[in-house]
Amino acid sequence: MAELTALHTLTAQMKREGIRRLLVLSGEEGWCFDHALKLRDALPGDWLWISPQPDAENHCSPSALQTLLGREFRHAVFDARHGFDAAAFAALSGTLKAGSWLVLLLPVWEEWENQPDADSLRWSDCPDPIATPHFVQHLKRVLTANNDAILWRQNQPFTLVHFAPRTDWHPATGTPQPEQQQLLQQLLTMPPGVAAVTAARGRGKSALAGQLISRIAGSAIVTAPAKAATDVLAQFAGEKFRFIAPDALLASDEQADWLVVDEAAAIPAPLLYQLVSRFPRTLLTTTVQGYEGTGRGFLLKFCARFPHLHRFELQQPIRWAQGCPLEKMVSEALVFDDENFTHTPQGNIVISAFEQTLWRSEPETPLKVYQLLSGAHYRTSPLDLRRMMDAPGQHFLQAAGENEIAGALWLVDEGGLSQELSQAVWAGLRRPRGNLVAQSLAAHGSNPLAATLRGRRVSRIAVHPARQREGTGQQLIAGALQYTQDLDYLSVSFGYTGELWRFWQRCGFVLVRMGNHREASSGCYTAMALLPMSDAGKQLAEREHYRLRRDAQALAQWNGEMLPVDPLNDAVLSDDDWLELAGFAFAHRPLLTSLGCLMRLLQTSELALPALRGRLQKNASDAQLCTTLKLSGRKLLLVRQREEAAQALFALDDVRTERLRDRITQWQFFH
């Protein structure tokens, strides 16, 4: 085939130039598969084949692709005929060597946007796959506008355009690149203070951090949201590598000459400030684009707190040439570029709402909103882009300046569960898809019907750093109330800090829940708050806030921190307590969810209750209690604790307990 001969010549040119390209095969399944095999046979290479089904040799499923990160391959096939895993697609592109093709298999071009996407099961909260027309239309726009991508469609003539030659590329040798070497020297001679290195993926920032550790005369501690992501850093640091998780480091009195924080944007600013203040020198690294996270917003906020921050940026790719067509195309397709975040919005701000249909008529606006949200929120990923474009129940507000988006709010519909399902969630018997706050209100609250109420959760909110402290965030929340009707509440779930909570308080939210353990990656407790919009919403917020006040002392005793509520010293078992205790004793409500009412039960009961008292009053560990009570594991310990709660309830009022047990037992028969 003349096409394969031309591709063979182009592949040799790509290898000399140090670049990779995308080749799209769009058509019926058999046609795509046959042409992919012909490409594989014609062009020597590894030909990693990413597909849900093992269709070819060297196969890997999209979900298992993360196990291959850090390895390199020549040529790959990404099968997206039945579903497009955007994060896996981006990750695969990062594993390909210079001179490689990424062959993308797509459905028939004209039928693609109406075809259900199996990947939507991961992010749409729908029981069945849904069509994703907005993402497909966006991807089509990118593919047809990109002259460096090759589009080969069934029943269409294949034309291979001429690509002008580029400068020959010289691959890295393993020693620091000139850009790295210059930055390394600056860091090694840096006076006490804080330095931040930002880079897109594949620029060698982790290697740079490891090289710094290996060359300093003193000691260093590495921290990061996940130790598994520090493998490259550890490789270059050698014997000097020493990792401590953020929460463990904060709780310790460890000291070192340097603190190195890998992917610092993933750590909440309050925790990061505390860590940085303890070390004479700190190096922060963060990704400013890509599926691993975005860090420009973090950097702008951090600069405001540390005006003398030493800022560095690595721009030169290590494993391929600058301006690689594949990297550019993936960045455009998955909206990795957050350069707009560096432009200051000017003029008066106008709040307006928009829906997903704007992706069809005016895609520039939702694209800018997504870029602002991803620039401000580290954990925004390609999954969020797909959810924003096509998942049901998504709503958006923008705060528009004269030239740029100054703020954005993303809301998600929640609740509206049936009475039976809400009761089953409360009892710990069911956990349906989605409904983060609505389910938590039932599963961790006192009202079995809480999830029947209809709410709208704040999924993301962001204001450009240059336009913060002007009340724009509060205007966005007020706008959400204005544009939202026939709902019971707005809700939010966030990592608790005093500063964040003060913002939500100013917006009118009521605190209804605090988590009972810190998140390891953030060092924060999860908080949930409601802004009531109906009488039913107001009653729910008041009931759950009152419960939180009653539980405040027990939670503070457990967490070692006071809650931001006025505690109530009330040891009398209420009607809500009786119902919750029955839910623990006769259903599957968790021990710590029932912490407050169980503590009140222990104060009321005269029984020994060793499994409950040992855990909640004496703070014995599960392992210690299993040994003392001669139990063979945590499951049996929890069974014993439920039995003890039932014994205590029967001893207090057997008739009431019997009635509650019969009522709750009926809820498990929900289907």
Please name every model-derived segment.
Residues 393-412, 419:
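Conserved beta-hairpin
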Residues 248-250, 258, 270-271, 277-378, ...:
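Terminal substrate-recognition subdomain of acyl/acetyltransferases
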Residues 207-211, 460-482:
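Conserved acetyl-CoA-binding loop-helix of GNAT-fold acetyltransferases
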Residues 125-175, 303-342:
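Conserved coupling/interface region of RecA-like P-loop/ASCE motor cores
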Residues 20-28, 38-52, 198, 218-230:
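Conserved RecA-like ASCE P-loop NTPase motor core of nucleic-acid helicases/translocases
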Residues 2-10, 171-191:
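N-terminal pre-P-loop "Q-motif" helix
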Residues 65-162:
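N-terminal accessory nucleic-acid engagement/regulatory domains that precede
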Residues 32-33, 205:
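Conserved lysine of the Walker
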